[in-house]
Amino acid sequence: MSQILEKILSEKALEVSSLKKNNSLSNLEKIGHGFKRRGFEKILFNFRTQKKLAVIAEIKKASPSKGQFKTDFDVEEISISYESNGAACISVLTDKKFFMGSLENLALARNKVQLPVLRKDFIIDPIQVAESFAIGSDCILL
């Protein structure tokens, strides 16, 4: 395993531990039921039946290998641009330490557009799946 991946997984284990101390799986699931899901699978199926390329556009501020991509980073503006230019879905990086993402970025994107929103993070525990559900993710990338 690469050194950076080991660091990321170690950090995720700490985050999961903190998440479990402050939340229960059942409470996060209950919160998640308050969101109307936007049909990630249905959107992709519709693009396919129309013989159109379905683009999942990514909101990503930084990466461990490239650093920060952009200093003026407006999640709402990016989301609107992706939707108006025909994206099928929006993927939002939520890893804070290594990709400068956040759960708040996912919420901002979700509140600004009607597209399904995917949470992209290093998901290593079922409580993170429940957390994703609780913040309004329509799907996750494992």
Task: List the predicted regions and their residue ranges.
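Arg/Lys-rich RNA-binding interfaces used to dock onto structured RNA substrates
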Residues: 56-64, 73, 91-94, 103
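Hydrophobic faces of well-ordered beta-strands that scaffold small-molecule active sites
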Residues: 55-59, 90-92, 117-120, 140-142
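Surface-exposed amphipathic alpha-helices with a cationic face
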Residues: 45-49, 83, 106-111, 133
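An N-cap/entry alpha-helix motif that binds or orients negatively charged groups
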Residues: 2-70
